[in-house]
Amino acid sequence: SLDHAIQGDTLVSPYHKSDDGQSLRQFDFVVSNPPFKMDFSDTREKIAAFPARFWAGVPKVPAKKKESMAIYTCFIQHVINSLKKDSGKGAIVIPTGFITAKSGIENKILKQIVDNKIVYGCVSMPSNVFANTGTNVSVLFFDASKSNDKVVLIDASKLGEEYKDSNGLKKVRLRDEEIEKIVTTFQNKEAVDDFSVAVSYNDIKEKGA
């Protein structure tokens, strides 16, 4: 067991609630690494019973490959709801395809976070960089202060070096200098050829978010 770690279902029975138990507690910082390829079919209807929390909706369970349900969209909504109003910051691991979604729950969330200027950055990571999934993932960053005028988009998918984990499977890890490059570029919102851009919220809206 881990000190200060609590096991449970944060979507159905969130541990951190307001004193009256009717809403989520809000925090200065929230991070989330949602489970990928896990079957949530048994709890889908329980999650859907909270429409105020899951304002963009709850994805349907696929008839085949139930574990491919886009449950991460619920975790995005949970993170946003858990940010302290006007000051909270958050980050969440998502499938890279989310940021180009043109319909469905994904697009509803994109419109909300762009229209409200909550999202302020996204870093697309190399394949096989996460231990528990081969899915291409990105890290999405939120800032409830709405103080940013641009969103920084970084493509780090071509970075990293291959190695084999303890099971002999090929994985990718970022080198120290690559991590430094990502952090510096993100903080400075720099535009770097073939690596990053900083775009206004209006530009994102015009392109369909």
Show which residues each predicted segment covers:
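N-terminal low-hydrophobic presequence detector
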Residues: 1-2, 33
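Conserved SAM-binding strand-loop segment of SAM-dependent methyltransferases
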Residues: 2-10
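A conserved structural/catalytic subdomain of Rossmann-like adenosyl-cofactor enzymes
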Residues: 14-17, 21-209
